């Protein structure tokens, strides 16, 4: 009996030791995997680093590319497009004007009543309409007929407040946020469609001409006074309310910048210098690239997998379209190489663009003790049923790295523009007031991003100069801005000037 007891005891001891060894091995394996997670995190943080010296290099490279793009067509990755807008709104504009804003799957028609310096925008009315999917890939005349049908019905609802003097033609500003080769203030040919549109017979056609032909088909008498993109609309809207606005930046799904340049500083401009001495330049800065940009393996793979490899490099690391996708790619590597979400990689994590930037922003903004929002988003988006607090903290760290890099590079770009136009220092000992008008959901709604961008710009400018540089949110520039540009370039301005002087 004693031998049986001893044997049983020995067997139990062996079993306990084996179980303990298994637990130890699992813990060691788990610790090894977690060490790999931290290793991936630290490497990513180092690759994304944006010390102030690097930001200055990026800003200097931006300035060099701006000079090159202004010198000749195709001389730079920055297109530096001449907009033909040489007269931004001053606030003195009066009358009522229309705007048409086409930049995606929705479009808007708008009318604004302007009351001059004191009354400003007296009244505005608008209608928004979705474009049926079949029109996004159909024929050019079908799309423009649909748009003009909505516009004509909107015109028919003018109330008594919107009174057109006898003999005057309605005037419209057309915001068209697709790549265009501008031919004049009110004409430009489509280079290519983006954002899900694919209408072959519009490419290389004057988009204003297509719009006017559609108007003529329904008997709508309206002059297209200005063709602009959303960034120039934002600049116009900002200048209308603040005469010190010199730069506009869109930070939304995509990104772009426009600014006021001295006309004599544009070597590729061969026309007569405008009376104002100024010209608005549409930079198309999303296409900026430089060896100084801190690019990672995830950025390179995202670029290779994109529809336009090698293009829009800056946009792919700072805009709302891509920030969430960068996060997904880092999490996927952690899941595959370090079992971050357990032994099985969540199938949803393999779907490109499943993590949208608004979701990333919501997680980044989570201040609850247990990071409840992060856990909820991981469950809702990736179907990760459980996540530990330390996992959630890693996700927060990744959000912070990605957003901080994007925000600081945006600030470097703005600083580069200010350097180009001599607004990065005091002039004759005096500070020049410079205002940057911002628009776009990324800047407006992702607080950590916008705050980081503003503080980084201040860091680059220094305390003294930053006192005279202001960053403001200029909502709805793409709508109101186009109407304001129609007003500031109205065909009736010279008649009004003549009547005032006579």
Swiss-Prot record:
Domain Hexokinase stretches: 35-487
Region (Hexokinase large subdomain) residue spans: 229-476
Keywords per UniProt: ATP-binding, Glycolysis, Kinase, Membrane, Mitochondrion, Mitochondrion outer membrane, Nucleotide-binding, Transferase, Transmembrane, Transmembrane helix
EC number assigned by the record: 2.7.1.1
Region ranges (Hexokinase small subdomain): 90-228
Residue positions binding D-glucose: 194-195, 229-230, 256, 284, 315
Cellular location(s): Mitochondrion outer membrane
Residues bound to ADP: 104-106, 253, 441
Keyword DNA damage: no
Pathway note: Carbohydrate metabolism; hexose metabolism; Carbohydrate degradation; glycolysis; D-glyceraldehyde 3-phosphate and glycerone phosphate from D-glucose: step 1/4
Main location: mitochondrion
Gene3D superfamilies reported for this sequence: 3.30.420.40, 3.40.367.20
Keyword Transmembrane: yes
Membrane topology: Single-pass membrane protein
Transmembrane spans: 4-24
Tissue: Highly expressed in siliques, at intermediate levels in roots and flowers, and at lower levels in stems, rosette and cauline leaves.
GO MF term list: ATP binding; D-glucose binding; fructokinase activity; glucokinase activity; hexokinase activity
Disruption phenotype: Plants are overall smaller with a reduced number of flowers and siliques and display a glucose-insensitive phenotype which allows them to grow on high glucose concentration medium (>6% glucose).
Domain of life according to the entry: Eukaryota
One GO term of the biological process aspect: glycolytic process
Similarity-based family: Belongs to the hexokinase family.
Protein name in the entry: Hexokinase-2
């Amino acid at each position: 009996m004693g031998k049986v007891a001893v044997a049983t005891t020995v067997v139990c001891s062996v079993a306990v030791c084996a179980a303990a060894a298994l637990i130890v091995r699992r813990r060691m394996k788990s610790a090894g995997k977690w060490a790999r997670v931290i290793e991936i995190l630290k490497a990513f943080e180092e690759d994304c680093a944006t010390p102030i010296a690097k930001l200055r290099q990026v800003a200097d490279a931006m300035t060099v590319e701006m000079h090159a793009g202004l010198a000749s067509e195709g001389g730079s990755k920055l297109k530096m497009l001449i907009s033909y807008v040489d007269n931004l709104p001053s606030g003195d504009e009066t009358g009522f004007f229309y705007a048409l804003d086409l930049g995606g799957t929705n479009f808007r028609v708008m009318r604004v009543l302007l009351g001059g310096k004191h009354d400003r925008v007296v009244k505005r009315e608008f209608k928004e309409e979705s474009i049926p999917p079949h029109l996004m890939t159909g024929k050019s005349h079908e799309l423009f007929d649909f748009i003009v049908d909505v516009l004509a019905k909107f015109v028919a609802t003018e109330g008594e407040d919107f009174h057109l003097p006898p003999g005057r033609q309605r005037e419209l500003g057309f915001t068209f946020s697709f790549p265009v080769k501008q031919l004049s203030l009110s004409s430009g040919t489509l280079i290519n469609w983006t954002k899900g549109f694919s209408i072959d017979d519009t490419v290389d056609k004057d988009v204003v001409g297509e719009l006017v032909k559609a108007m003529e088909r329904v008997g709508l008498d309206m002059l297209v006074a200005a063709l602009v993109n959303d960034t120039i609309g934002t600049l116009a809207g900002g200048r209308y309310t603040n005469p010190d606005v010199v730069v506009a930046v869109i930070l939304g799904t995509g990104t772009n910048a426009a600014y006021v340049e001295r006309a004599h500083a544009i070597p590729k401009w061969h026309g007569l210098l405008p009376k104002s001495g100024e010209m608005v330049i549409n930079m198309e800065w999303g296409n900026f690239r430089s060896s100084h940009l801190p690019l990672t393996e995830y950025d390179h793979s995202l670029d290779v997998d994109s529809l336009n490899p090698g293009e829009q490099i800056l946009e792919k690391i700072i805009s709302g379209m891509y920030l969430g996708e960068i996060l997904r790619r880092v999490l996927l590597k952690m899941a595959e190489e370090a079992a971050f979400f357990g032994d099985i990689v969540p199938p949803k994590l393999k779907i490109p663009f499943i993590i949208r930037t608004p979701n990333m922003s919501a997680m980044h903004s989570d201040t609850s003790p247990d990071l409840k929002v992060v856990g909820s988003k991981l469950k809702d988006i990736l179907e990760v049923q459980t996540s530990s607090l330390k996992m959630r903290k890693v996700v927060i760290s990744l959000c912070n790295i990605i957003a901080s890099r994007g925000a600081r590079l945006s600030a470097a770009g703005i600083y580069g523009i200010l350097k180009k136009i001599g607004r990065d220092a005091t002039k004759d000992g005096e500070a020049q007031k410079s205002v940057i008008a911002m628009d776009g959901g990324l800047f407006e709604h992702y607080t950590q991003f916008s705050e980081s961008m503003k503080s980084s710009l201040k860091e680059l400018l220094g305390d003294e100069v930053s006192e005279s540089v202001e960053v403001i949110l200029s909502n709805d520039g793409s709508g109101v801005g186009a109407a304001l540009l129609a007003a500031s370039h109205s065909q009736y301005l010279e008649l009004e000037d003549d009547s005032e002087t006579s």
